[in-house]
Design a protein with these regions (language model features):
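Short sequence/structural segments immediately N-terminal
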Residues: 2-5, 14-165
């Protein structure tokens, strides 16, 4: 059964790559284990091409998330992981990257180095980012948060992303 699922999945990826006219490897994001702090570029790098999105983000609570942490909580991995850029698991393992405080673009869209390198190389079609869905938000907006409030994805996503660029 597992083999059947793998064959079916590889067929779906292959067909999707043909439909998108993209190389298969561009559709497959690196696994979280392959991503390190060095793969994160920071919101200022995103701003170079996505100024409207940056300006909209800069007016959100995400842009001020690290400053909202109490001083005592800034050394707790379970708190910091959701208040700086990177996955909570990566931050717990490597510590926060000082130049990337707050919940920046890459906290939700994924590490940007590969995306930026592709775009700068003239391959904007392959400059893909992580798909954002409710599960992305629930990595931090969940019952483990000491200030948890019920999270309604459709209502909240519009507060963060007010622009498509």
């Amino acid at each position: 059964m597992a083999r059947f699922i793998m064959v079916a999945l590889s067929g779906v990826v292959f067909v999707a790559s043909l439909a998108a006219r993209q190389p298969i490897d561009s559709l497959l994001a690196p696994s979280p284990q392959q991503i390190t702090a060095a793969d994160y570029t920071g919101a200022d790098a995103c701003k170079e091409c996505h100024e409207k999105a940056f300006d909209a983000w800069n007016r959100t609570k995400h842009a001020k998330a690290f400053g909202k942490l109490q001083t005592a909580d800034r050394n707790k991995a379970e708190c910091v992981g959701c208040h700086v850029t990177g996955t909570p698991e990566m931050v717990a393992a490597e510590g926060p990257k000082p130049s990337h405080p707050n919940v920046q673009c890459e906290s939700c869209h994924g590490a940007g180095k590969r995306h930026i390198d592709a775009a700068k190389g003239g391959d904007a079609g392959n400059a893909r980012t992580m798909t954002i869905d409710e599960a992305t938000c629930l990595r931090c907006h969940n019952e483990k948060s000491p200030h948890y409030k019920p999270f309604i994805y459709r209502a909240m996503v519009g507060l963060v992303h007010r622009t498509g660029n």
